């Protein structure tokens, strides 16, 4: 008797992806974040869908509709805070997932890696537009500042900004289109995730040693399904602790004040997960230069496969590169801190040094260290 799981046209796709998939026997907890990102995406889509049922994308009623969700809708407060803090969990998992790829050399699967970078851009765009929707002070001024950056593009900049705004300032038209894009982008992201997985399953997973693991594979189910469920339960635990005990921990108090175009908040800053890029943007005193640095701070990830000069794939057996990698992590934490500080001495100079170090480590120091390590091993 033939097994439906292996013969049914639709079920066999699921089978080859999540059940009978040959997986390396030694992948660590760092490989859990892919499935956790999938879980985050599902949580965000469902909570977002229920929020959209009660939200109105009009400048006059947007702020009130969010208040209405929190006060009058059954468990509306829970859905709203799960969605807001779910975004934070999403980005924590994203950063750890990308960091894992950098550390273990997963970027050598360059189709998978490049689609991952595009996914990162898309999730960042989605999160930015979502932050505008509650129409608080930080929503309005964040949208104004970030969209205004496009005016730095020569010739077409001003026209482009006014086209995105749908007028001469951030207003009703901007809010409506941001809501539309915020709704559609997660579904496009989901489609891209499938392409990401398609390319990953062409090559199979990498593993901590960076060596080919074809000779030692185990089925995904039950080994990694159980492992992923454990990760998922821990993620939900952390998310719910955040939501139920301190839902506003990662938010900005300014966003509890309705948007007012006539009063600028003293410190305009984005959500915590954009602060590292915001710090890089602010560290360059030229508008166009800042915008380019901002874009390249993420786009630089696409260069990783080209900058890999080591004869080994993973950093597991490369102590010098490991050391530099953790300095890079510390640098990104420093940038995140600086992004939330006012533009004054000594924060300006710290931000500039941290930005220079960020690009120097990736473009210059890590490749150089890789060559030194090759020489030390007489390769």
UniProtKB/Swiss-Prot annotation:
GO CC terms in record: mitochondrial inner membrane; respiratory chain complex III
Gene3D superfamilies found in the cross-reference section: Cytochrome Bc1 Complex, Chain C (1.20.810.10)
Record text on cofactor binding: Binds 2 heme b groups non-covalently.
One Pfam assignment: Cytochrome_B
Protein topology in the membrane: Multi-pass membrane protein
Needed cofactors: heme b
This protein's record includes keyword Mitochondrion: yes
Coarse class of the protein's main subcellular location: mitochondrion
Single GO molecular function: ubiquinol-cytochrome-c reductase activity
Binding, a ubiquinone: 201
Localization annotation: Mitochondrion inner membrane
TM segment ranges: 33-53, 77-98, 113-133, 178-198, 226-246, 288-308, 320-340, 347-367
Family according to the record: Belongs to the cytochrome b family.
Subunit text: The cytochrome bc1 complex contains 11 subunits: 3 respiratory subunits (MT-CYB, CYC1 and UQCRFS1), 2 core proteins (UQCRC1 and UQCRC2) and 6 low-molecular weight proteins (UQCRH/QCR6, UQCRB/QCR7, UQCRQ/QCR8, UQCR10/QCR9, UQCR11/QCR10 and a cleavage product of UQCRFS1). This cytochrome bc1 complex then forms a dimer.
Anything else known: Heme 1 (or BL or b562) is low-potential and absorbs at about 562 nm, and heme 2 (or BH or b566) is high-potential and absorbs at about 566 nm.
Protein name in UniProt: Cytochrome b
Species, as recorded: Marmota menzbieri (Menzbier's marmot)
Lineage: Eukaryota, Metazoa, Chordata, Craniata, Vertebrata
